């Protein structure tokens, strides 16, 4: 048991497996129904903070819509772990018949952050209930603006990304059976980067195309050439 960064009584470790599923379900459905884009998660942040206050959990605001909370156990053994969830949604119109589908036109929790936030709230609720049964401190990060890639910066600027022993973050996967946790020694997910290419042409009379530069044709060729790059730059095994 001493290998755990938080030290629980043995029966409480088992009890931690039984979080309030109904609370988690209701929270997830509320968040799914009220999605907000990166940096605009005001209602989401208010919902999270209201629940933390109900549970008696101390927290501080991070930026306008991020939230950082902490739960101290019965004894401060100097050990800290960080649990993190993202909270923002995507600019996608939801086309489902769910009873709790998005009420915000053009915005949807299509990446599962509603589940992440609800799960962390459920964990926070349970940890608050067994607070007297563990030693150490649990830190909770409800991170805004993950989709735009700058949400963590607010936590960094406030010095909240140091001083803990381990950090845990999860992401749901619809192709993984319910109740299964997947761990990987290597990267298990990916993100995308954006870049812009500008092709500048030069006009010419149709009778003298050789005096011009056809940006459209160059663009068509470029698309095909870019598609070849991975096979030429990366090993086949990757």
Language-model features: where?
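Histidine/acidic-residue-rich, glycine-tolerant segments that coordinate divalent metal ions
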Residues: 90, 97-108, 115, 132-238
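Acidic/His- and Gly-rich active-site-bordering loop/insert found
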Residues: 8, 12-109, 114, 118-134
């Amino acid at each position: 048991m001493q290998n755990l960064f938080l030290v629980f009584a043995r029966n409480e470790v088992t009890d931690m497996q039984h979080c309030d599923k109904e609370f988690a379900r209701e929270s997830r459905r509320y968040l799914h129904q009220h999605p907000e884009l990166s940096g605009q998660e005001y209602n989401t942040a208010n919902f999270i903070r209201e629940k933390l206050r109900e549970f008696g959990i101390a927290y501080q605001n991070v930026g306008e819509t991020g939230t950082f909370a902490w739960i101290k156990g019965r004894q401060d053994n100097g050990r800290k772990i960080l649990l993190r969830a993202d909270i923002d949604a995507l600019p996608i119109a939801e086309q489902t018949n769910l009873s709790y589908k998005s009420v915000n036109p053009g915005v949807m929790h299509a990446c599962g952050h509603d589940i992440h936030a609800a799960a962390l709230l459920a964990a926070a609720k349970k940890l608050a209930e067994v607070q007297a049964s563990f030693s150490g401190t649990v830190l909770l990060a409800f991170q805004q603006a993950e989709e735009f890639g700058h949400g963590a910066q607010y936590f960094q600027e406030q010095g909240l990304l140091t001083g803990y022993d381990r950090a845990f973050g999860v992401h749901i996967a619809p192709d993984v059976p319910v109740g299964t946790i997947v761990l990987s020694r290597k990267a298990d997910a990916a993100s995308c980067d954006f870049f812009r290419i500008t092709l500048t042409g030069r006009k010419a009379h149709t009778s003298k195309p050789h005096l011009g530069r056809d940006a459209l044709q160059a663009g068509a060729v470029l698309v095909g050439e870019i598609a070849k790059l991975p096979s030429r730059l990366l090993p086949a095994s990757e």
